[in-house]
């Protein structure tokens, strides 16, 4: 049955307008994005199939163009729409960080990092460079590595901090395995970077490890 034939209160779009987006399932939200289904399948049916194929909404959103387009009916136009939506979300979170003091909105920082790094297949080390009031100056992905490791060069981080005239920064890297507990090497690296940057009068405010579903903050766990 087409969604247009459903009772009004069950249709995803009407449900969102009357009850808010939190009331919708992943499949219902995705159906609004898809707009239409296929012969014999409603948009909700198609959304459920996509979620089952990729395993989760996060994996679907971060599928490669080749993986996404391999699904019948999901061509380059839908892929472009999806990634435009993701980029809008990233930029909105980045603006929220930029216009407020970063430490006053740690959840915004976590959301931005999770959306940006959480589903990357290789380890990426990145920095948020901040001014004296802890507002965002720049975001840079500095090093990329393998599934388990990205080689980090403290001198390069120091050079970028000086380039941006940063007074502080937040370190971040993802764990593609999804486990966010810091390793011993993560702890050692953080201490080394704190010492090296302190010589330049640049303060490391936090180091965040990003997984698919959560973000670990060194500051919140008393490790800074």
Swiss-Prot record:
Q: Give all residue intervals belonging to the MPN domain.
A: 102-224
PROSITE patterns per UniProt? MPN (PS50249)
Family classification: Belongs to the UPF0758 family.
Q: Which domain of life is it from?
A: Bacteria
UniProt binding sites for Zn(2+): 173, 175, 186
Q: What is the protein name for this chain?
A: UPF0758 protein RSc2444
**SUPFAM superfamilies on file:** RuvA domain 2-like
Tell me if Cell membrane is a UniProt keyword of this record. no
Q: Which Pfam families match?
A: RadC, UPF0758_N
Keyword Lyase among UniProt keywords: no
Keywords linked to the UniProt accession: Hydrolase, Metal-binding, Metalloprotease, Protease, Zinc
